[in-house]
C-alpha cells in the first residue's frame, strides 16, 4: 500500500480553494492508495465559527466520497463540520474522516479539544476511539492535541492498530514537541505513525509542517520539506511490523489500566 501525506498551505476559510488544491494532488498521485490531509484542511483552525462558515457533515462526506471514487484513492483528514445529529451542543465537531473508494465512510470526532485556543467553546468533543480496518491494515484516527495524551493513543487488545494517523495544525513554536511526540508514540506502541501538519499562516500562528511517516523503531520513513507545501510517500511493510512485534513483544507487558 502506498500512502501519501499532503503538507498543505491551507487557504483561510476558503473551502473551494482547498478542495481544488486537494484534487490537484490526487490528479498528480495516480498510484497512491491513501492520501492523508491536515487538520481542518478546508478552513484552517477556526475555533469559534460564525454562521455559514462551516459545511454540514453530509456535504463534506459527499465531496470526499466523490473524490475517493473518482481517483480510486482513500482520503483521511480533519474537517470542521456542523452536525445536527450530535446529542450535545454546540452541534459542531472537529471530525477526522477516513473515506474509501469502495464507499465506506468512517469518522472520529476529536476527543481532546484544545482548551488554550478556545476549541472547546466552538465544538463538542468525541468520546470514542476509532480504528479503521482497510485492505488488511488497522488505522487509529487521531487529531492534533490528542498526540499529547499517550493513554488515549495506547495500543491495547480492545483498540489494536498498525498505523496511528495524527492530522494537525501544530504551530511552529512547538515544533520540537511535535517531532518528539510522534516518535515517542511510534516507539511505545510498536506502530507506524503518520503525522500530517499544515504550513503557512493563520490569524494566530505560523506553521512549518514536519509532516512525516515514522517506523516503529522511531526513525523516519518519509518527510516533507520543512516550511514547503508538498507531498511525501511511503509503503508500510506489514510483514516486518508483525515480525518485530513477535520477536520483541513489549505490548504484551503493557499496563492494563
Q: Which residues are covered by each model-predicted region?
A:
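CN hydrolase (nitrilase-like) catalytic-core segments centered on the catalytic cysteine
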Residues: 57-76, 148-229
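Cys-nucleophile CN-hydrolase/nitrilase-fold catalytic domain and related Cys-dependent amidase chemistry
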Residues: 15, 24-101, 106, 171-185
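Short, acidic/polar
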Residues: 16-26, 148-154
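Binuclear metal-dependent phosphoesterase catalytic core
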Residues: 219-245
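Short beta-strand scaffold segments in enzyme catalytic cores
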Residues: 77-79, 94-98, 130, 195, ...
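Active-site-proximal beta-strand elements of phosphoester/diester hydrolases
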Residues: 1-10, 14, 107-109, 137-146, ...
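Active-site catalytic loop in hydrolytic enzyme cores
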Residues: 87-159, 173-180, 243-250
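Hydrophobic residues at beta-strand termini and immediately following loops
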Residues: 6, 108, 132, 196, ...
Amino acid at each position: 500500500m502506498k500512502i501519501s501525506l499532503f503538507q498543505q498551505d491551507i487557504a483561510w476559510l476558503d473551502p473551494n480553494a482547498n478542495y481544488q488544491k486537494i484534487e490537484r494532488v490526487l490528479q498528480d498521485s495516480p498510484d497512491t492508495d491513501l492520501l492523508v490531509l491536515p487538520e481542518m484542511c478546508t478552513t484552517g483552525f477556526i475555533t469559534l465559527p460564525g454562521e455559514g462558515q462551516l459545511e454540514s457533515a453530509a456535504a463534506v462526506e459527499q465531496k470526499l466520497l466523490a473524490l475517493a471514487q473518482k481517483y480510486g484513492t482513500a482520503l483521511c483528514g480533519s474537517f470542521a463540520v456542523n452536525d445536527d445529529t450530535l446529542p450535545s451542543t454546540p452541534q459542531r465537531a472537529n471530525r477526522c474522516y477516513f473515506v474509501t473508494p469502495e464507499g465506506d465512510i468512517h469518522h472520529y470526532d476529536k476527543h481532546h479539544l484544545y482548551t488554550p485556543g478556545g476549541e472547546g467553546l466552538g465544538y463538542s468533543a468525541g468520546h470514542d476511539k476509532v480504528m479503521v480496518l482497510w485492505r488488511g491494515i488497522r488505522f487509529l484516527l487521531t487529531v492534533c492535541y490528542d498526540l499529547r495524551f499517550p493513554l488515549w493513543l495506547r495500543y491495547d487488545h480492545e483498540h489494536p492498530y498498525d498505523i496511528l494517523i495524527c492530522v494537525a495544525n501544530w504551530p511552529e513554536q512547538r515544533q520540537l514537541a511535535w517531532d518528539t511526540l510522534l516518535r515517542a508514540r511510534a516507539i511505545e506502541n510498536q506502530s507506524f505513525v503518520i503525522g500530517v501538519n499544515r504550513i503557512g499562516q493563520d490569524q494566530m500562528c505560523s506553521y512549518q509542517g514536519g509532516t512525516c511517516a515514522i517506523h516503529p523503531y522511531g526513525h523516519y520513513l518519509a518527510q516533507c520539506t520543512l516550511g514547503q507545501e508538498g507531498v511525501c510517500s511511503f509503503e508500510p511493510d506489514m510483514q516486518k511490523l508483525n515480525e518485530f512485534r513477535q520477536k520483541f513483544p513489549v505490548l504484551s507487558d503493557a499496563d492494563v489500566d
